[in-house]
């Protein structure tokens, strides 16, 4: 079953996507067409390759899309600006890729398993309902609180509907030199490391130490200010950080592993978005 086929619980009886949240002209919902997925891939290409300088393969350069084998299996959370006078698939201004256990089985593993020992999570808690978050990006002119809130609203609604126990995935620092992010990485290592029962370690051949500075040398305020917005957002929710960073040469990033058990999400955020994700519906 493809990602599109697996989404029926979040579609209305007429096949239209159910709106998971709305703020003004912005709406968040799941992709329910190949045109929508391709539009998300085009947005990812513009952000990751044209803006951030990821390395283009031949097919990506020709098609102008960031696409891989996971896209047909995953669900794609999309933010639309319905006020734009263009066809619907061209209204997409933000995206998040979501993959549950059963989808990962069809893909022969989670995307982040290429960098981290995700299998440890599955083996230590075989009954956990896992959700991998990835490929998060937003058009530059829409990088605002409203857009981010709608992406979180959509992810939270998805978690509630699928009874997810833990969210995880890679988050990135721009640049493939860990030492350039010594302050941020060291802060995460000393203050945000996962507890033993949730810990996930970078694969041995990709492991990069994060404790590049002693704890007493870290200015916490400056470290947090230097942190990528996505990482800070995860931390505010209650996320923990896995053991070791990983260099992603293709995307030109230094990645860290995010682990966010639902039980650890800050109560104020659950109150804000609603226990049943009905804040912006």
UniProtKB/Swiss-Prot annotation:
Pathway: Lipid metabolism. The keyword Transferase applies. Its EC number is 2.3.2.30. It catalyses: a (3R)-hydroxyacyl-[ACP] + L-ornithine = a lyso-ornithine lipid + holo-[ACP] + H(+). Disruption phenotype: Deletion of the gene abrogates lyso-ornithine lipid and ornithine lipid synthesis. It does not affect resistance to bactericidal peptides or permeability of the outer membrane. Does not influence pro-inflammatory responses or the ability to multiply intracellularly and generate chronic infections. InterPro entries: Acyl_CoA_acyltransferase, Ornithine_N-alpha-AT. Coiled coil: none annotated. One of its GO terms (molecular function) is ornithine-acyl [acyl carrier protein] N-acyltransferase activity. Disulfide bonds: none annotated. Keywords: Acyltransferase, Lipid biosynthesis, Lipid metabolism, Transferase. It is an enzyme of class 2 (transferase). It holds the Pfam family Acetyltransf_5. Belongs to the acetyltransferase family. OlsB subfamily. Catalyzes the first step in the biosynthesis of ornithine lipids, which are phosphorus-free membrane lipids. Catalyzes the 3-hydroxyacyl-acyl carrier protein-dependent acylation of ornithine to form lyso-ornithine lipid (LOL). This is L-ornithine N(alpha)-acyltransferase. The gene is olsB.
